[in-house]
Amino acid sequence: MKLEHPDRLMNRTPLSLAALETHDAFAERHIGPDAASQQAMLDTLGFASRAALIDAVIPASIRRAETLPLGPFAQPKSEAEALAALRALADKNQVFRSYIGQGYHDTHTPAVILRNVLENPAWYTAYTPYQPEISQGRLEALLNFQQMVADLTGLAISNASLLDEATAAAEAMTLLQRTGKPASNVFYVADDVLPQTLEVIRTRALPVGIEVKTGPAADAAQANAFGVLLQYPGVNGDVRDYRALTEAIHAAGGHVVVAADLLALTVLTPPGEWGADVAVGNTQRFGVPMGFGGPHAAYLAVRDEFKRQMPGRLVGVTVDAQGKPALRLALQTREQHIRREKATSNVCTAQALLAIMASMYAVYHGPHGLKTIALRVNRIAALFAAGVKQLGFAPINDTFFDTLTIDTGARTAQVHEFAKARRINLRRVSDTQVGVSFDETTTRDDLAALLAVFAQAAGGTAPSVDALDAGLAGVAALPAGLERTSAYLTHHVFNRHHSETEMLRYLRSLSDKDLALDRSMIPLGSCTMKLNATSEMLPVTWPEFGRIHPFAPAEQTVGYREMIDQLEQMLVAATGYAAVSLQPNAGSQGEYAGLLIIHAYHASRGEAHRDVCLIPASAHGTNPASAHMAGMKVVVVACDAQGNVDIADLKAKAEQHANDLAAIMITYPSTHGVFEQNVREICEIVHAHGGQVYVDGANMNAMVGLTAPGQFGGDVSHLNLHKTFCIPHGGGGPGVGPVAVGPHLAKFLPNQRSTGYTREENGIGAVSAAPYGSASILPISWMYIAMMGAKNLTAATETAILNANYIAKRLAPHYPVLYSGPGGLVAHECILDLRPIKETSGISVDDVAKRLMDYGFHAPTMSFPVPGTLMVEPTESESQEELDRFIAAMIAIREEIRAVEEGRADREDNPLRHAPHTAAVVTANEWPHAYSREQAAYPVASLGTNKYWPPVGRADNAYGDRNLFCSCVPMSDYA
């Protein structure tokens, strides 16, 4: 129900409790325009109601007939009720002390980072830093991440994060396939690599014809492989000297990838110093909770020769218009949004927020602090090894950093039983061995409890920790010659922010440089930058979600799995499909999983030869990149003058490839912001020729409650929980990309057999390192749906469409709206055509984007899907007041352009060509421009009370790519 003013309620008699209930209160806070504003916007559009507008926008043939079937979540919960319900689920989880290891470790998140990064909307509501001038803070934090990884691995350059260690290793494999030994299709994986990594590698290798071989690391040089993956230290704890082996692999024409633990590299010789070509790994133990598997920031570092083949985003240093240092995303021509099927990867969303947390962990602790943590962890492992030896157990690895594998023989079951009684998890290596991995959170009491477990199994008395410590003068746990001697983290940023005061101010200085949703709307088309409500974010930091190991026993994760099951059913209801998997940890991975599922379906019918994927010319770049990774051949389908799929061309291509047609990938509403009228026909054409229909769910925010891909012909979709379902973008991740499928595809949803998770016997292999992907952020979407309920989720969709049409209507007299449906209406976004402006004034879409920064706005999506355009998506969360502020800015900019067109302003010396204007430029003694300082900085009156200052002038992209530098900048360069 709508909230009523208390004065009106007081006039009613009797005043009932029901009249005072506020279950819809959250929806009123999530949806920006109130009833009066919505009616005013509808009046502008010429509609009497939201329902009338929606009837005109969405084809009647695909409208949902029923209300969202959300079952127990159909009615909205208040924020307090939803938090209480989720708390009840969280309390069903059991937080044991987990020594399972296998790539995941408990960690302390420094409180200053928890409160001022993870819980700070200035960081978590920002978008990917494609607009560098308003992203300098997070770009610096990501540059710190790159410097940290490069220093610790001993390699030349690192990217700014990948999704998890397993997918990073798979990306390294395909990187070396592109650049390595042309006569070989073999990738060799040492047998002590993390099991989940091997499984993801196998999943990735099969569609692209790579043969994966496994065996002892010592045999790698004889494998005739283009690449070899080594684990350092190994999953069972061994620290091996790979120097001679690496030389032998190189001599045989292969390259070496090393999956390395960054904390271990503070005391071990880094891979780059003994010949590794690529290093990959996870930064989770640098202050990021385990979270039942994620999200965490993986890394990939390479030798200099491979830098232009790297996947993922790369922060580089350039100069701005005034010649001052500025940061930007470098070498973007590698990425899928430009290179499409020829991209180095399909990765779009990465793990920026988690990379920032990990980098700040290194900044806060510094090199000395990190090494102290590492030495302490290693010391605890050494004391444990000495203790279990006294009890008659034999560690099988003489060398170790933090992990020991203990031969427990016939007493193995007892060890696990006694550990469980003390709320301790150990790794189940085999029927005769257990694994124990230590971390920075391990205390003396924890060590004593562990020793007591083994003593109980041995029928003896545990030695005291103090006695062990006093009696162990030193430990030869590392191979001779592998102790690190080189310096790392020598840059000043890692050596000055070690007090909380300094760290707090550093974090504040960075966040102040950036423009995020906490300052203004971010109207990026195809990105859905909507409210990430605080109540949705709160559960992310609960220990009952954060401190759960992804491979913990099932009885300890009951609450997690109930929440996941409920969220899957919520998404089934929203999409109209039969089943959902939450394993894919980004939209790109959901796409990839969906295409693998389609291939598995065809193979199950004896049609594995079907490998042609039809993709409209207007598609997002991840579509062709994912199809290529899935082993499919991309065939482009033309679009007509209105941006719709050209039905005649589709029919011709479907007929031409009928024997080999695997799928079509379409986006709905389409990438040009319109509900195509003939989407059912598109689906029917593809089905008639033996193909499956993949509906990209990037624009699901225009469909929830109104239509559903599973009901109008789709067979499979991915969703973006970081768009439609309120997980924040985090400056470029995390995200979740669930894959949703029809009933005939449900049996092919992904498994992760290496860790004991088998969802479907015929399911595809794992697509992420953990069974449920980025599980710890799933409560965000659960909370959003629970607090909205069926009616309000539909209202949110309707309001998103209303807001977009209001902007399109108001701006149409000033900028042509490139595409529209019947009645001149759009879906949830609109494309403004700036190409005529370029012809008449020389002002480019880039100039307009930079000028918007002076008005306090992030630019809409530039030049997608059409070069020279801006795609605007306001979402339902923005109020009419904020929409009007954006509209006023765009109209004012159009007047500035008109001044150029009419000769009242110079074609070069005008506020657009020199935007954005920094405070330093505006307040300088000299002002060389024909326009005033006031016009530069305060072009509209509202900026007088709320002004955002870009910290740098326009970044020189070409200079940055010509002079690639991706490390922290010396302080002297800022002088």
From Swiss-Prot:
The N6-(pyridoxal phosphate)lysine modification is found at K723
Summary of subunit composition and partner proteins = The glycine cleavage system is composed of four proteins: P, T, L and H.
Q: Which domain of life is it from?
A: Bacteria
> What is the protein name given in its UniProt record?
Glycine dehydrogenase (decarboxylating)
Q: Give EC number(s), comma-separated.
A: 1.4.4.2
**Species:** Burkholderia ambifaria (strain ATCC BAA-244 / DSM 16087 / CCUG 44356 / LMG 19182 / AMMD) (Burkholderia cepacia (strain AMMD))
**Family that this chain belongs to:** Belongs to the GcvP family.
Keyword Zinc-finger part of the UniProt annotation: no
Q: Name one GO molecular function term.
A: pyridoxal phosphate binding
> Which Gene Ontology terms describe the biological processes this protein takes part in?
glycine decarboxylation via glycine cleavage system
**EC top class, in one word?**
oxidoreductase
Catalyzed reactions: N(6)-[(R)-lipoyl]-L-lysyl-[glycine-cleavage complex H protein] + glycine + H(+) = N(6)-[(R)-S(8)-aminomethyldihydrolipoyl]-L-lysyl-[glycine-cleavage complex H protein] + CO2
PANTHER family attached to this UniProt entry: GLYCINE DEHYDROGENASE (DECARBOXYLATING), MITOCHONDRIAL, GLYCINE DEHYDROGENASE, DECARBOXYLATING
This molecule's function is given as: The glycine cleavage system catalyzes the degradation of glycine. The P protein binds the alpha-amino group of glycine through its pyridoxal phosphate cofactor; CO(2) is released and the remaining methylamine moiety is then transferred to the lipoamide cofactor of the H protein.
Cofactor(s) needed, names only, are:
pyridoxal 5'-phosphate
* Keywords, ordered alphabetically: Oxidoreductase, Pyridoxal phosphate
Give the InterPro entries listed for this entry: GcvP, GDC-P_C, GDC-P_N, GDC_P, PyrdxlP-dep_Trfase, PyrdxlP-dep_Trfase_major, PyrdxlP-dep_Trfase_small
Would you tell me the Gene Ontology cellular component terms?
cytosol; glycine cleavage complex
Asked whether the UniProt record includes Oxidoreductase among its keywords, one would answer yes
Q: Which Pfam families match?
A: GcvP2_C (PF21478), GDC-P (PF02347)
